[in-house]
UniProtKB/Swiss-Prot annotation:
Family membership: Belongs to the GRB7/10/14 family.
Gene Ontology annotations of biological process type: ERK1 and ERK2 cascade; gene expression; insulin receptor signaling pathway; insulin-like growth factor receptor signaling pathway; negative regulation of D-glucose import; negative regulation of insulin receptor signaling pathway; negative regulation of Wnt signaling pathway; positive regulation of cold-induced thermogenesis
Lineage, highest ranks first: Eukaryota, Metazoa, Chordata, Craniata, Vertebrata
Gene name of this polypeptide: Grb10
Entry protein name: Growth factor receptor-bound protein 10
Organism, as annotated: Sus scrofa
Region Disordered: start-end pairs: 1-51, 77-107
Length: 589
């Protein structure tokens, strides 16, 4: 900040006045000179002594030059503190003018070039009795900087860069979102959840979709969206969908790593928990091994080879199942590649099975000849290979991504209302027929209690229908259409489409959806995932006392509508292999 005016402009500053009174060796009378008439000292006694006029003028000139030299070294420059000490050797005094009246004109700005050279020297002369005041305008102290702020004087990276990202939903709708350049996939998902008024259960994911290559993968929560977007082709796009299996291997690793596929390099055996720790520990070296169908680069043929996955890459054996270094050939590197699942491997690449996946180098955009295509024998094997690839590549980053939502929930829990968490371990069958309740431990008795609960739900629904309904529709008509308002009902979709949706949103136990039956127009189908397998259960209508009910078990447990049926099987397993936990959902952006 340039300071205008002559040296006397400092004298009007109160802080400078205190410094002058404390440190200036000159008497106020000595500060007067040509152009600065001295004020008469009213307190001093009038002296009648003769004064040497020539000596007085010389003293006044010397005092004025000393003051100008001190002004050039800017005693107020650093944090408003007066620098005590001699000026640096590099500081040049002002040139003497021909006339003393033009030596310090009032309109001349303060010369601060010499003062800038004092920035480092002044640090050691700064007084310790006064607090350090930070410079509010550091960009003005650089050499060649203008005295006023301008957009060009700001650092080039200070302004946050923004970029537009187009995100598609499952129903084909899209939304253009303006995001920051450093926004991660998790942050963008939370933004879309907020704007779409969805429930944030930390299972949303951003999917990188390549329709021309038949590939897709879920972005990791820590990945920057703009960096991934720069590698996409014009046909590629981002999808916003659920993925309940994103971190399921941390909760139940036994379903993801079969014992016959996992080998140990440092120890011969270990538990599943130790296996995860070895995957997360960069110093250990667990391996995944097994036979895979491998497509040759540039050809349409597939070969079944013995493959092993390590931290250094994916290798195949050129001699049976031998893992000797001279028999191993590198197929793909983990660092500069990403793993994708094949959407239609049989149709597009002639894959021998439906459980294909691909390791795609990050530099590849449109060419399929550089893709490393592989196929497993079943879904569990494919999930094991893909999960191990993610763990070996990202390590602790995945565990940190998994822990972040839980840590946020723990921080916010004291500020939120307590919500009861319903889980399998906290639910037991109870008998309240007597004066006190008791836990039913006999499985057969618990099954009969579940059937009685179903009859109780049916009676309560019938009683409500008899009392009347506020809906203009007839109660029986309302019970047959009210399920269409639920997210878990997907209408008239085929069996293949329902299986595809469940696979996309994660093969976890309890993932389900309801749809119209294609074989029976009056029936419905419950599609449920259990142990990474998809099963279908038909829901048939039945009549009792003129009322229409729905049942999964041939009329043993009846419900007046599908909402009651879903609510019941979320709490009771009944005839199903597991309880209903997660429902497939499609959100329109």
């Amino acid at each position: 900040m340039a300071l205008a005016g002559g040296p006397d402009s400092f004298l009007h500053h109160p802080y400078y006045q205190d410094q002058v009174e404390q440190t200036s060796p000159h008497h106020p009378r000595d500060l007067a000179g040509p152009g600065f008439p001295a004020q008469p000292d009213r307190l001093a006694p009038h002296q009648e002594d003769d004064v040497d006029l020539e000596a007085l003028v010389n003293d006044m000139d010397a005092s004025l030059e000393s003051l100008c030299s001190a002004s050039e070294t800017a005693p107020l420059l650093h944090n408003g503190q007066h620098a005590r000490g001699p000026p640096p050797p590099g500081a040049r005094p002002l040139r003497p003018q021909a006339s003393p009246r033009h030596r310090v004109p009032r309109s001349q700005p303060l010369h601060i070039l010499a003062a800038r050279r004092l920035q480092e020297e002044d640090q050691q002369f700064r007084t310790s009795s006064l607090p350090a005041i930070p410079n509010p305008f550091p960009e003005l102290c650089g050499p060649g900087s203008p005295p006023v702020l301008s957009p060009g004087s700001l650092p080039p990276g200070q302004a946050a860069a923004k970029q537009d990202v187009k995100v598609f939903s499952e129903d084909g709708t899209c939304k253009v979102v303006e995001i920051l350049a450093d926004m991660t996939a998790r942050d963008l998902c939370q933004l879309l959840v907020y704007r779409s008024h969805c429930v944030d259960d930390n299972s949303w994911t951003l999917v990188e979709h390549h329709p021309h290559l038949g590939l897709e993968r879920g972005l990791e929560d820590h990945e920057r969206v703009t960096q991934v977007q720069h590698t996409l082709a014009s046909e590629s796009k981002f999808l916003f969908r659920k993925n309940y299996a994103k971190y399921e291997f941390f909760k139940n690793p036994t379903n993801f790593f079969p014992e016959q596929m996992v080998t140990w390099c440092q120890q011969s055996n270990g538990s599943q928990t130790q296996l995860l720790q070895n995957f997360l520990n960069s110093s250990s070296c667990p391996e995944i091994q097994g036979f895979l169908h491998v497509k040759e680069l540039g050809r349409k043929s597939w070969k079944k080879l013995y493959v092993c996955l390590r931290r250094s890459g994916l290798y195949c054996s050129t001699k049976g199942a031998s893992k000797e270094p001279r028999h191993l050939q590198l197929l793909a590197d983990l660092e500069d590649s990403s793993i994708f699942s094949l959407i239609a491997g049989r149709k597009q690449y002639g894959a021998p099975t439906d459980y294909g996946f691909c390791i795609k180098p990050n530099r590849v955009r449109t060419e399929a000849k550089e893709l490393r295509l592989l196929c497993a024998e079943d879904e569990q094997s494919r999930t094991c290979w893909m999960t191990a690839f993610r763990l070996l590549k990202y390590g602790m980053l995945l565990y940190q991504n998994y822990r972040v939502p839980q840590q946020r929930k723990a921080v916010l829990s004291p500020f939120s209302a307590p919500v009861r968490s319903v889980s399998e371990n906290s639910l037991v069958a109870m008998d309240f027929s007597g004066q006190t309740g008791r836990v039913i431990e006999n499985p057969a008795e618990a099954q009969s209690a579940a059937l009685e609960e179903g009859h109780a739900w049916r009676k309560r629904s019938t009683r409500m229908n008899i009392l009347g309904s506020q809906s203009p529709l007839h109660p029986s008509t309302l019970s047959t259409v009210i399920h269409r308002t639920q997210h878990w009902f997907h209408g008239r979709i085929s069996r293949e489409e329902s299986h595809r949706i469940i696979k996309q949103q994660g093969l976890v136990d309890g993932l389900f959806l309801l749809r119209d039956s294609q074989s029976n127009p009056k029936a419905f189908v419950l599609t449920l995932c259990h142990h990474q397998k998809i099963k279908n259960f038909q829901i048939l209508p039945c009549e009792d006392d003129g009322q229409t009910f729905f049942s999964l078990d041939d009329g043993n447990t009846k419900f007046s509508d599908l909402i009651q049926l879903v609510d019941f099987y979320q709490l009771n397993k009944g005839v199903l292999p597991c309880k209903l936990k997660h429902h497939c959902i499609r959100v329109a952006l």
